[in-house]
Amino acid sequence: MGERTWPQLLAALLRGDELSTADTAWAMGEIMSGSAGSAQIAGFAIALRAKGETPAEVSGLVEAMLQHAVRVELPEDLRATAVDVVGTGGDLAHTVNISTMASLVVAGAGVRVVKHGNRAASSSCGTADVLEFLGLPLDLGPEGVAACVAEAGIGFCFAARFHPGMRHAGPVRRELGVPTAFNFLGPLTNPARPRAGAVGCFDARMAPVMAAVFAARGDSTLVLRGEDGLDEFTTAAPTRVWAAQNGTVREALLDAADLGVPRATLADLRGGDVACNADAVRRLLAGETGPIRDAVLVNAAAALATQAPLDGDLTEALRTGLSRAAESIDSGAAARTLNRWIEVAHAVRPVLG
């Protein structure tokens, strides 16, 4: 395709043609820069969704989004070993903040975490909401986040702060009211670019697409989708896992019950408003046992497993991760991580922003 125009791209999508990575990168660049009109954004998002996004198309969206992001610069050795524990959201299950709690557990186990998230969209309480309620400032800039990762072992990139260009798509997304490619970009566009992670996806078709994008850029990532629709490693049903590592993707169906984790129900994992979900975080870190702890442990185990080769027995890798995750909570390390994180964040905020 020569000089790109919206009519050309939209006509191609309506014919069912696949776009190139360069095509979708151009479109996303137009959106992020504020050059695209609302009709163009809506038409593009819906036409791409109706055709079905390919890994190459999603890669273009991700590439442009990261180019427009406020980047968090981490030392390469730290970035190479850091993880993200994150989900797409959108499963409409209204659970507690499992990935947020798992992030604290992973950091308590000694693995650096750079979490990327936002306020609630389809749920009652998003990552940003619960972290803010617990006392973490959300407005830290890239230097502040990097300092938290270095000194506390965990940092948080508030999506609204680090992807300002996405504000141009926000009104259209809200008016459309249906999932589009935009709903799956968050876990793929962490501005610190950690090389590993456990990523939940509620959409069965998009989960392998996301895994292919992670694989293509050389990341070590487990993409997770519960057979009950959760964008987590669920304890209420088996979980389909796409293991992306060394440029390849391997799919498996795993069950937390095979790890000795008791079967839960979705009701066991349900949260509420921000005060309710923050209380669940505190109770977990204080050592409370039960279905919420079980779900957090298995998701933390998934993130910890990405630090090792994923071409072997995934169940055994998760079993090892479970033990490390439990020790993180039971030793008090996860609780100390949260306290230290809040302390560092408030200390660096006036200096680094």
UniProtKB/Swiss-Prot annotation:
Task: Give the residues the record marks as binding anthranilate 2.
Answer: R173
Question: Per the record, what are the reactions this protein catalyses?
Answer: N-(5-phospho-beta-D-ribosyl)anthranilate + diphosphate = 5-phospho-alpha-D-ribose 1-diphosphate + anthranilate
Q: Which GO terms describe its molecular function?
A: anthranilate phosphoribosyltransferase activity; magnesium ion binding
Name one process (GO BP) from the record: L-tryptophan biosynthetic process
**Co-factor remark:** Binds 2 magnesium ions per monomer.
Query: Binding residues for 5-phospho-alpha-D-ribose 1-diphosphate, per the UniProt record?
Result: 87, 90-91, 95, 97-100, 115-123, 127
Q: Does the keyword Transmembrane helix apply?
A: no
Which residues are noted in the entry as anthranilate 1-binding?
G87, N118
The cysteines covalently paired via disulfide bonds are none
Asked whether the UniProt record includes Transferase among its keywords, one would answer: yes
What's the superkingdom here?
A: Bacteria
Q: Where does Mg(2+) 1 bind?
A: S99, E232
Q: Which cofactors must be present for this protein to function?
A: Mg(2+)
Query: Which terms are listed as keywords in the entry?
Result: Amino-acid biosynthesis, Aromatic amino acid biosynthesis, Glycosyltransferase, Magnesium, Metal-binding, Transferase, Tryptophan biosynthesis
Q: What class of enzyme is it?
A: transferase
UniProt: Mg(2+) 2 binding residues: D231, E232
Annotated pathway:
Amino-acid biosynthesis; L-tryptophan biosynthesis; L-tryptophan from chorismate: step 2/5
UniProt xrefs under PANTHER family: ANTHRANILATE PHOSPHORIBOSYLTRANSFERASE
- State the protein's name: Anthranilate phosphoribosyltransferase
* Naturally occurring in which organism (per UniProt): Salinispora arenicola (strain CNS-205)
